[in-house]
Amino acid sequence: MRHARHARRQRGFTLIEIMVVVIIIGLLAAVVVPQFLGRVDDARVAKARQDIQAMETALTLFKLDNFRFPTTEQGLQALVQKPADPAIRNWRSGGYLKRLNKDPWGNDYQYVSPGAQGEFDLSSLGADGQPGGEGPDADIGNWTLGE
């Protein structure tokens, strides 16, 4: 009888053991998941900063060739396709960028020339897609890259 009871206990986990494991997994998830989500936001902000720096370089090359930045109306598209109005005489064959990417949150980058912060303002509106905000919702602009 003693041997039979011992063999039966060896066959599987008790409900209590399974509940303890589920609770431990839940506690670990409660600690790890928020830290992981914060890292995703940090990575998106870093990607937006890199995109803005690359577009800033392309805009500078555009100005070196054409003695001015694209107008607000021409926008960033002037870095990919030759603008027709006003005509650009020294537009680089192949353009200044291969394509325009959206920001890491799926929104268009904002471009204004002349800008309120400098010769041009180039920015992402952040996670919320609205001007202003804090944390991942904060705007990321070419004027904030040094921060």
PLM feature spans:
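Aliphatic-rich helix starts adjacent to a transmembrane/signal segment
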Residues: 35-53
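Alpha-helical hydrophobic helix detector
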Residues: 16-35
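Conserved catalytic core of two-component sensor histidine kinases
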Residues: 22, 49, 56
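Short, surface-exposed interaction loops/tails
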Residues: 2-3, 42-45, 57-60, 66, ...
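N-terminal leader/signal peptides at the extreme start of proteins
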Residues: 1-13
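Short, conserved catalytic or interaction motifs in soluble domains
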Residues: 30, 38, 42, 64
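Short, glycine/small-hydrophobic-rich surface segments
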Residues: 59-99
